[in-house]
Curated annotation (Swiss-Prot):
Predominant localisation class: nucleus
Biased composition (Acidic residues): 117-138
Statement: the UniProt record of this protein carries the keyword Zinc-finger: no
Gene name of the encoded protein: cwc15
Pfam families: Cwf_Cwc_15
This protein's name: Pre-mRNA-splicing factor cwc15
Region of interest (Disordered), ranges: 1-21, 63-186
Amino acid sequence: MTTAHRPTFDPARGKEALRGPAYHQRLLPAYTHLKVRQSGQGTEGEAARRDLRAELLQAEAAHFAKKNGAPVPEASAESTPKRQLEGAPANGGDGELEEDPEAKRRRILEETREIDADSEASEEDSSEDESDDEDEAAELMRELEKIKKERLAQKEKEERERAAKEEEQREVDIARGNPLLNPSDFNIKRRWDDDVVFKNQARGTEDKRGKEFVNDLLRSDFHKKFMSKYVR
């Protein structure tokens, strides 16, 4: 991040200039106290008191229950093993807080048995769903093949019809383009400029009538012929 927009706190001075007692804020000591973890922030003692295996089994049971649509079992205080409190004697009056190893083993076996049963049921359901999905996919593929064949047949039919129409039109064009079959095409057509005023002025000058003022288009021969042909 640039600091070009900040004002100069300590401008340059000569060697003989005396410096005052002011210090920049960045030159002051900072972070003089070390932060430590407080209670509830995952200290070593809290990590030692956690039973990670029980938490994992409980999370797996909740997951399979949610997947199978069964009610999620609530976490009970009895299901979580109680560890020895810090500062308590190892063999004292509070020894009953620790769970019996045999009871703990039986509880873990029961939980794992339930989880295995749930997983087997979910596997059976998933296998049935997979078989149904395969049947539906096969049916869809058959329908798709049928639609493709119908479209291909329709396209071939349209191609044949178009080819037949093109062949028929070609034969008609050939027949009409034959001058022997169309004698009317031998008629000589007049040019569009046959009756204009200034066409072939040098031809037939000896047969010209008297001098006429042709620049007046309203009284020219072309205008008269045009009016008599298309207006009258």
